[in-house]
Amino acid sequence: MKELRLFLRKIDQKVISKGKHYLLTLIILYRYKTNEVLDHYKEQTPQKEEPIGATSPIWVCWWQGEKKMPDIVKVCYSSICRHADNHPVILITEKNFQEYATMPDFIMQRLYKREMTITHFSDLLRMNLLKRHGGIWLDSTILLTKDIDSIINTSLPYYSHHHIPNNCNVVKGKWTGFFLACGKGNILPSFILDAFYNYWKNNNRIVTYLFIDSLFALAYKHIPAVSKMVNNIPVQPMSNLSKCLNQEYDKKAMETFYTLSLIHI
């Protein structure tokens, strides 16, 4: 009886979660007029899709700069540099981001007034960089144990870590905002960036923490060119090292992590 109650509780949680995501998507789509941005992209079929490229930049952001990185971030950043193959690693900071990305004044005002957090600003930043330059975005807390080109097919126009989900959020394992790559001018970051701009022109507070994933979900559902790119990426394993942060180091456990997955978060 206890097992049945636990099972039904899990089912209820999944139903409630899916309902919340669905309602939030409708709010973003119609109340905040994202549907108007979608209309511009729905029927777009790129004539020539730029590949990610074997020498495209790897973008990593730590706002305060490398010297202010916590130890765990330094280790992750070092692993990215070590496994970058022929990709130059560019660290984006508060001091240099304007060398690579141009943001509208109203976005910068939202940031300076603290109406927008640095975390959310980094979502806009990654889409801006990928649209303008192409390349590979890696969050600064990703640990690589294999060379990047053994994970990504750089001849493709798009990559994100397609994985088996461990929860029922809007992502459904089809993509990750923390590991995303594409060629210059790709339709996905172009749409998401325009949708962000459209929202922040008229709002001074984020509608949801996972706003980027909600926009990704809308792109996947309504833009055939996006769903085609996403569905073309095979499922890959991903380990969650964050669950082990407070545990004593175990060499065998780490070796197991290394064999099960190529990236670790």
What label would you give each PLM region?
Residues D123-H133:
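Small-residue hinge/turn detector
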Residues M1-S122, S140-I263:
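Glycosyltransferase-associated regions of secretory-pathway enzymes
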Residues G135-W137:
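Short aromatic/hydrophobic "clamp" motif used to bind/position activated sugar donors
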